């Protein structure tokens, strides 16, 4: 049995008011992801899958290679952080998904991205 390498995912999201246009149903959010390699071997992020859901239940799937134009290799005890964005038609939504990773032996595995909320500050009490 192959033990999957341990990778921790931490997410922070924020509303970008200066780029949003609520009167046109355009709400812009940024999210910062930190990936930490808690295992004993290097791992590499090679792809991503996102499920983005707005407050009306409309779902959008996004998948592709790497993140922000990179396929980072993360050493044991190391981390990789990046910031990206999402545009919703509602002031509230969620994102979730997974990263496609490989270890040094070429063994592929998924790392889950937990559900996180995208919300304008006035909706968070």
Swiss-Prot record:
Extract the SUPFAM superfamilies matched here. Answer: ApaG-like (SSF110069)
Query: Which domain of life does the protein's organism represent?
Result: Bacteria
According to the entry, every stretch annotated as the ApaG domain falls at 1-125
> One Pfam match, by short name?
DUF525
One biological process term from GO is: error-free translesion synthesis
Q: Which PANTHER family match?
A: F-BOX ONLY PROTEIN 3, POLYMERASE DELTA-INTERACTING PROTEIN 2
Protein name in the entry: Protein ApaG
Could you tell me which species this protein originates from?
Sodalis glossinidius (strain morsitans)
Give the source lineage, highest ranks first: Bacteria, Pseudomonadati, Pseudomonadota, Gammaproteobacteria, Enterobacterales
Name the gene for this chain: apaG
């Amino acid at each position: 049995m192959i033990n999957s390498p341990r990778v921790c995912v931490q997410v922070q999201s924020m509303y970008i008011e200066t780029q949003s246009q609520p009167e046109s149903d355009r709400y812009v959010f940024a999210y910062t992801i930190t990936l930490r390699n808690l295992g004993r071997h290097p791992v590499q992020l090679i792809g991503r899958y996102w499920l983005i859901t707005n407050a009306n239940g409309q779902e959008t799937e996004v998948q592709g290679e790497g993140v922000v134009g990179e396929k980072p290799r993360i050493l044991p005890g190391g981390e990789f952080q990046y910031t990206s964005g999402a545009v919703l038609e509602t002031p509230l939504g969620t994102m979730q998904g997974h990263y496609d990773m490989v270890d040094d032996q070429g063994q592929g595995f998924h790392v889950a991205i937990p559900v996180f909320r995208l919300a304008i500050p006035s909706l968070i009490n």
